[in-house]
Amino acid sequence: MILGFVEVSHESLALAEAEAVCGAEALGGGGVAAGVPIPGLVAVEVPDRDALTQLAGRLALARRCLVPIPAEGDVVVAAGGEGASGGSASFRRLGRPSGGGADEAVLASGRAFKRAGGSIDLERPDRRFWLARGNEGREYLLEQVAAIDRVAVAQRRMPLLPFQRPVSLPPRLARAAVNLGRVTPKDRVLDPFLGTGALLAEAGLLGGRLYGIDRDPAMVRGALQNLSFLGVAADELLVGDSREVEFGERSVRFSALVTDTPYGRSSSTGGEAVLELISRVLERWSDRLTDNGRVVVVVPSGLSPGALPGTPRFRVPVRVHRSLTREFCLYEKAGLTRSSC
């Protein structure tokens, strides 16, 4: 295992940090409680650098994945040591826009790298180094392993899809929810409130096998349009009541249930209160989860602690749209019981 860092970036840092840790868990690693105390970074443990690159390909609420360079308290000396192997590099301050004025530690690190035999290239460097100041004032030298492709995520925004509804989760938040579910290739993923298919689309892009249910035939047709547009195929999408319908493969078990519960005037619950509907649906499908299965459910904000069944591992309010806040709740199968939250 190696130590890595994720630079998170979202107004809900709690959700961004949880996404990074759960994403690392999906790759055989996890979070590190005693990480380097650098603001804006989450410490994770992954099998190797390739896994850190894979993590960058999974995440949506982050900027980059990095590894620490041993500095023994002097980042300039460490930068010189890296320059001895040649090649080009860039040096910047983490969390500070380029062109923000002179930074002596950054400049000195670049000079040391160059003196040792390397060269400086700010446009297309072979390696990208970042300096970061910890909470205790100590300087750290980090090397970027991979950057998050935020443009690709933005290209999946609702206005760019063929089937559109104003209340659908933005792709960044949908991807974060799927990462909380630790979805990996070939995992079967269920969304019992399919909607526009935003959650299943993100699960499919991570290689998951997709199953969805919605009582509105128009939503199922629209979700199929969106999935096809994004190059994602579903195993089975059903029209009907999530408490009653059954998939063709009756014994199918799911690694993750990930859903955004109905809300807004355009959503249909068949006249049932949303909280009661959620509880009944989770009760119906929880025994179809694999032993280490997870449930990620996005619910109306402001619920009382006992409003949902089970004990969540993680629960945080997140602003989804300008005037709409929802709560992201993560359950392990073992914690999805009738005890109060």
Summary of predicted features, one role per range:
Residues 13, 20, 72-140:
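N-terminal auxiliary segments of SAM/dcSAM-dependent transferases
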